A protein has these predicted regions:
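C-terminal catalytic-base region of ester-bond hydrolases, centering on the histidine
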Residues: 162-259
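Short, solvent-exposed loop/turn segments at secondary-structure junctions
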Residues: 12-14, 48-50, 83, 109-111, ...
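A structural micro-motif
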Residues: 4, 40, 72, 98-101, ...
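Glycine-rich, phosphate-binding/catalytic loops in enzymes
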Residues: 23-26, 92-95, 120-122, 186, ...
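Short aromatic-enriched loop/helix-cap "lid" or pocket-rim segments at secondary-structure transitions
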Residues: 19-21, 113-119, 124, 178-183
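Active-site catalytic motif of lipid deacylating hydrolases and related acyltransferases
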Residues: 1-74
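Serine-dependent carboxylesterase/thioesterase catalytic core
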Residues: 10, 42, 54-159, 199
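Hydrophobic/aromatic beta-strand patches that form the interior of the parallel beta-sheet core
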Residues: 7, 43, 104, 168-170, ...
Length: 259
């Protein structure tokens, strides 16, 4: 069992489970329950789904600090924007860095996201995105602006991380994910435009960061990294015949074994 609290930090448009209640829908699909069954202490805080990195990072640090026992440390497993939130908190929230042992970022746009750039600049790529995603981000500009390439470049210059914390970065490779992907069309277009492996939202070059231990790309798109694929929307008796079984829980077990 991991020594310390495992925190699952959600990305933009995401949600937590701060009370730890059973739920039919979780941002990290089935991960919290799976880790609890293995005996780990898990916390899924809620931050503003549309907020800026600064707002979300402060909320993340506050939520974690409220539940940590005296002397206890935490291991943050963050998806997408959640990784930027955690980085902000570690640098800017007084004393928070002393309570964190590990930061794992999964599909985090450390150098920005081509999807955010596309929505801001209204390029052809934005037309390939789900309408609910573009509409929500356009209405809530805090998160959208902070995820652009230019904004993340500034964030990286002003956010100097502590080398005392173990840091792990995981990219996604939608091209290896098979036909159960949700974002396969977007991932293919990003690959054509950038020439990079990507998960349909974040390129591998952006998901990896200097000073972090780099894991091999997960064969999934951005949604699949947290367990959401076509499996999630059809009865098991159908998907088990036509789609490969979901494997994301094993990926999280791999991470937890490193903590």
């Amino acid at each position: 069992m991991v020594d310390g609290l495992i925190v699952l930090a959600h990305g933009v448009l995401g949600f937590g489970n701060p009370l730890g209640l059973p739920s039919l829908v979780n941002y990290f699909n089935g991960v919290e329950e799976h880790l609890r069954q293995e005996g780990h202490q898990v916390f899924s805080p809620q931050v503003n789904p549309f907020g800026s990195i600064a707002q979300r990072g402060a909320e993340l640090a506050s939520a974690i600090s409220r539940v940590l026992a005296d002397g206890q440390k935490t291991h943050i497993i963050a998806h997408s924007m959640g990784g930027l939130d955690a980085r902000y908190a570690l640098v800017n929230v007084p004393g928070f860095v002393d309570r964190v042992a590990t930061l794992v970022t999964i599909g985090t746009p450390h150098r920005g996201s081509p999807v955010a750039d596309a929505i801001v600049n209204n390029t052809a790529l934005s037309a390939q995105l789900p309408s609910f995603l573009t509409e929500q981000l356009q209405r809530n500009a805090g998160a959208l602006h902070d995820l652009t390439t230019d904004s993340c470049a500034h964030f990286n210059q002003t956010t100097v991380e502590s080398s005392a914390i173990r840091r792990i970065a995981v990219p996604g490779d939608a091209s290896q994910g098979g036909h159960e992907l949700i974002l396969f069309q977007v991932a293919a277009l990003i690959g054509q435009l950038t020439g990079e492996v990507n998960d349909g939202v974040v390129t591998a070059g952006s998901a990896l960061r200097e000073g972090y231990t780099h894991l091999d790309p997960w064969p999934a798109d951005h949604a699949g990294e947290i367990g959401w694929s076509l499996h999630s929307f059809f009865p098991a008796q159908l998907t088990q015949r036509f789609l490969p079984p979901p494997t994301h829980l094993a990926w999280y077990d791999q991470i937890v074994a490193m903590l």
